[in-house]
């Protein structure tokens, strides 16, 4: 049975770095889905498709998103193509939303495999400051939100710590996947 790996975690936890590393793994049946976001594309940030709010709304009305939500004054969407990828036997990983986990669970049921990337408060503060996108007040708000969301995670959400070396996190990620050997065995 294929799985939709729903990677969540606070801004600054390292989801984008982990997703870039996952793309390099020799697992051809593990597909990383991009997101549609109403913010400009970034050179070093997430590989996403930038849309205006109007473009996003049109796609939303057309049912082009399998999942969509709003956070931090932006709209986020995951394309409906992930459903096709799952039907074709691929495993799919998406950069999800902690606040939208319940809705994702309702849509995907047992296919959903939630993984929460965690970091210590000090590491998160340092990363948010280093990227320079948020004010000190916004950083404080994000830190509080990270703590609040962490306390509300359901017990089936697997925790993956990313305080240290990315390669160690990647290795732990691979060990969490109950299907990575089967996924690798289907190389074409």
Swiss-Prot record:
GO annotations of cellular component type: cytosol
E.C. designation(s): 2.7.4.23
Alphabetical GO biological process terms: 5-phosphoribose 1-diphosphate biosynthetic process; organic phosphonate metabolic process
Cited Pfam families: Guanylate_kin (PF00625)
Binding-site list for ATP: 9-16
Statement: the UniProt record of this protein carries the keyword Ligase: no
Top EC class for this record: transferase
Catalytic activity: alpha-D-ribose 1,5-bisphosphate + ATP = 5-phospho-alpha-D-ribose 1-diphosphate + ADP
Domain of life: Bacteria
Pathway annotation: Metabolic intermediate biosynthesis; 5-phospho-alpha-D-ribose 1-diphosphate biosynthesis; 5-phospho-alpha-D-ribose 1-diphosphate from D-ribose 5-phosphate (route II): step 3/3
UniProt entry tagged with the keyword Transferase: yes
Keywords: ATP-binding, Nucleotide-binding, Transferase
GO molecular function per UniProt: ATP binding; ribose 1,5-bisphosphate phosphokinase activity
HAMAP family linked to this entry: PhnN (MF_00836)
Family that this chain belongs to: Belongs to the ribose 1,5-bisphosphokinase family.
Function description: Catalyzes the phosphorylation of ribose 1,5-bisphosphate to 5-phospho-D-ribosyl alpha-1-diphosphate (PRPP).
Protein name: Ribose 1,5-bisphosphate phosphokinase PhnN
